[in-house]
Design a protein with these regions (language model features):
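Flexible glycine/acidic-rich beta-alpha junction loops that bind and position SAM and/or redox cofactors
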Residues: 27-30, 118-119, 179, 224-226, ...
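Glycine-rich beta-alpha loop elements in corrinoid/cobalamin-binding modules
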Residues: 47-153, 352, 356
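Catalytic cores of alpha/beta
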Residues: 120-125, 262, 323-338
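Radical SAM [4Fe-4S] cluster-binding motif and immediate context
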Residues: 157-314, 319, 334
Length: 524
């Protein structure tokens, strides 16, 4: 007689709750929600793809579109808090860590991104896991913290969690850049340009669902692999034919424009807009920052070539008050706004000596950093270094830049001239994309925020636009009661001390050994 075996005992794994946050300080230093900002942050949805759906409940939050995270209920919810963000958002990571640990002492805090990679020792002291590698490192963290069953078998972006994206999809087809500009955080990290397998790109596009427009978030969509570039265009044509999206845009370096064939190929593939880091119309300044790819052809010629080919040319302008006079910078802005043949910059930023970059070390060597500069001040709207001109004149100039004050009539005249020149060569949407940036710049910060008017009533102190005296954001005051052991988490991370030398926060952070070999994940 066959022996009857007892039924197999099944074990159900407990579900883990994961909160992933893109940490952000707004340039206005107010709690503004940038719901209209393009591009939006997508780091959280890429990180969310590391968690297994059948064992993890994942929520994403971006402080860019939703404002500062101060919801006690949400911050007490997760078993694991995953934090990412830009370099100057490091202190927000500390704030959210303090909030979450005050609500749940057992919460596991994981942090990564540029600030963590720049400050590895500092990060190891405050986070349970300081991830110093690519986003795939999170899979190793999950496996160690919870077990392999909580790791997704295939890591794809969780577009279903991206409540803030709207009709625009975001996909990455390559990683890093093949150039080494001295002010770029990618140069500081020294990582090589990488291409993705086309099947992985296809899977991302399919996972995003059908969108009216797709934006490719590569650091350099053109890159150094010409065959892969053409293959991606072939895939784009295939996906457009299947109705996944209709039009698209991307970020490219200026060497893309050396070949007229490139413009023809992207236009035939449905490209509406390309963003390129033009930075300046001053070739001497570009050479000083190793931005050599921008000096091979005249900037105006490059912009007009793109527009005449039916592709909007978008760019940012970097104004360096430490090496150029205010009168020189004003002349550059006068030139741009009086030249309707070109677009006006989508944004204007001051030069930023980001941690670990050649530019940062050059500033340290030349002793140009102002006293009491905070890491949070590295936002592109705050004077961090000793300027050529009188500081009062520089402050007035920087203040005016926030809305192009003094240039409004020139911008309107430029827009009218631009429309006359290109209305037969660009679609209506392209005209909106091209001219919208001009007019929206004049309306900052309201233009990219439905809650933009709120800051007019809540601003406690006026900005000084100088790092040494700039008031702290309200986020440095806890939004609710936190454990006293986290008091230091709400003090700003300092870059320089009161005499302008590197602060102990930086000296002890691991930054100065940034090029030394290190593990990809540092466990506290």
């Amino acid at each position: 007689m066959q022996e009857i075996q007892p039924p197999e005992k099944r074990t159900t794994l407990p579900r883990k709750r994961i909160l992933i946050v893109n940490c952000y300080f707004d340039d206005s230093r107010q709690p503004i929600r940038r719901t209209n900002k393009i591009p939006q942050a997508v780091g959280p949805i890429y990180l969310a793809g590391a968690f297994a759906r059948d064992t993890c409940d994942v929520r994403c939050y971006t402080e860019v579109a939703s404002g500062p995270l101060e919801d006690e209920g949400l911050l007490s919810w997760p078993d694991m808090l995953v934090l990412t963000g830009l370099t100057n958002g490091f202190d927000r990571m500390l704030h959210l860590t303090a909030y979450a640990r005050s609500k749940n002492p057992k919460v596991i805090v994981v942090a990564g991104g540029p600030p963590v990679r720049a400050l590895p020792l500092f990060s190891k002291k405050v986070f349970d896991y300081a991830c110093l590698g690519d986003i795939e490192e999170l899979c190793d963290v999950i496996s160690e913290a919870f077990g392999p069953a909580y790791v997704a078998k295939r890591m794809l972006p969780r577009y279903d969690l991206a409540y803030w994206l709207g009709r625009i999809g975001y996909v990455e087809t390559t990683r890093y850049c093949n150039f080494r500009c001295s002010f770029c955080a990618l140069t500081a990290e020294g990582r090589s340009y990488q291409t993705y397998d086309l099947e992985h790109v296809r899977q991302q596009i399919m996972a995003s669902g059908k969108r009216s427009r797709m934006f490719f978030l590569d650091n350099n969509f053109y890159g150094s692999d010409r065959n892969h570039f053409r293959a991606r265009l072939g895939l784009i044509n295939e996906m457009r034919g299947a109705g996944q999206f209709h039009h698209w845009g991307a970020l490219v370096t200026n060497d893309f424009y050396r070949s007229n064939e490139n413009l023809r190929l992207v236009r035939e593939a449905g490209c509406e807009l390309l963003f390129s880091g033009l930075e300046s119309f001053d070739n001497d300044w570009l050479r000083s920052f190793n931005k050599l790819q921008n000096t091979s052809s005249p900037q105006v010629e490059m912009v007009t070539k793109s527009l005449n080919a039916g592709v909007v040319f978008a760019y940012g302008l970097m104004l360096d008050v430490t090496s150029r006079s205010i009168s020189d910078l004003r002349r550059e802005l006068d030139f741009i706004t009086s030249t309707p043949e070109i677009t006006i910059p989508s944004f204007i930023t001051l030069s930023i000596p980001l941690l670990g970059t050649p530019y940062f070390y050059d500033c340290v060597e030349k002793d140009t950093l102002l006293p009491n500069t905070k890491l949070r001040d590295m936002d592109g709207t705050t004077v961090l270094q000793k300027p050529l001109d009188d500081i009062a004149e520089v402050v007035r100039f920087v203040d005016d830049l926030q809305s192009l004050k003094g240039f409004h009539s020139r911008v309107l005249k430029h827009a009218a001239g631009f429309a006359r020149l290109y209305r037969s060569k660009l679609t209506k949407m392209q005209m909106v994309l091209a001219l919208g940036s001009n007019l929206l710049t004049c309306a900052q910060p309201i233009s990219t925020s439905f809650s933009g008017l709120g800051w007019l009533k809540t601003r406690p102190r006026p900005r000084t636009f100088v790092s040494s005296t700039e008031p702290l954001d309200h986020m440095y005051t806890p939004a609710f009661r936190v454990d006293s052991r986290f008091e230091s988490y709400f003090k700003p991370t300092m870059v320089t001390d009161d005499i302008g030398q590197l602060h102990e926060d930086i000296i002890q952070s691991g930054l100065l050994e940034i090029h030394a070999p290190r593990q990809s994940v540092a466990r506290a």
